[in-house]
Amino acid sequence: LQERMVKVNVVPDHVDWKYELGEKVKFNVVVTKNRVPQENVTVWYEVAQDMMHPLLKDTIVLENGVLTLDAGTMKTPGFLRCRVWTKYDGRTVEGRATAAFEPEKIKPTAVLPNDFNTFWESAKQENVRIPMNVKLRLLPERCTEKANVYEWNVQNYRLNSRVYGILCVPVKPGKYPALLRVPGAGVRGYAGAIVEAEKGMITLEIGIHGIPVTLEPSVYASLSQGGLYRYQYQNWDNRDEVYYKRVYMGCVRAVDYLCSMKEFDGSNLLVQGGSQGGALAIVTAVLNPRVTGVVSFFPALSDLSGYEKGRAGGWPHLFRDSTDAVEIRKKKLEVSSYYDVANFAKQLKVPVFFYLGYNDMVCPPTSTFSVYNVITSPKEIVIMEEAEHYAYPEHWSQALQWIYSKQGM
């Protein structure tokens, strides 16, 4: 995160950013330069429910340097967001704040298919029949005194299709807990969770695209604009062809591998991820019961159908301002329900560490709260009101300490 000289500071009039239904919220706006409030600055603003079209919008000059906006209220649980922009030195600067209206009462719109569990059980059984065919390649340049580092890959989903990752194993002989780290969206290589392995756990950080994770950065850049461009939107009209079916199975297979290792202690295996990875962490724990805990930061793929009910849905926002024909959209809604994290979260049976930010417009809080609220297993949540689609280092550290505690370290 970079510090900015010019900031648009937007804050609601409740310190905790929380409101009761029907309670009115005011947003206070100040533009600062080097932390000094600026007068006679032109700003433009919008007030909208989470990811919806604006309810209020205007352009105004801050003659005395301060603006107080009466933003109204909400009558149903959710979020009301104020976004304010100004220009400085030819660059647009934005500030935002998001008021929470009884978010603990948000319920998912996603409908659980009658054959949800049957569908995924069948997929797992088909995958089991494919030989794992493990391949490991030592990466001497990444090894340390305490951890051996390998490029790892196994067969997954179909013959000659593979899932790749970086496996790190403590050098000292013994039995160790395991951590599977699943990725956020995008196409990239991975370094592996070496530090965690040095502290005494087996770690496996995987990619999802069926390509090696040790290639040159230019290869991933080319693929992200080529064959893997907009992969997250592929084939949502056929439940067996959705891009994420192979991905979900790859995560299950990664857990299977970790459980097969002679170094594994046999009882402690956590999954960690953020955004797309936050979704995969929850999904993996439901599809593979050997997972013993989950760290999920702002999970994607959450309550995807929200937009069809007039509220925010999760990344990748399949139904936001959709131009699909009615029948196509109906089919995609049906298919998406098999992949929706809200439908998996209802079945979680292991402890969960959850994180979200109110200002997140990638994985909006309406969608992530709809997931958190249906989790019935032991859970704890960290809310960073001002955070957009990121977490501060302190929160990643907090999550890691939670992992260590669950691993008995």
Q: Over which residues does each language-model region extend?
A:
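Gly/Ser-rich "nucleophile elbow"/oxyanion-hole loop immediately N-terminal to the catalytic nucleophile
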Residues: 230-274
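Cap/lid segment of the alpha/beta-hydrolase catalytic domain
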Residues: 188-249, 306-315
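Short beta-strand elements
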Residues: 90-110
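Short beta-strand/loop motif that positions the catalytic acidic residue
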Residues: 348, 354-356
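Hydrolase active-site cap/lid region
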Residues: 278-328, 383, 391-394
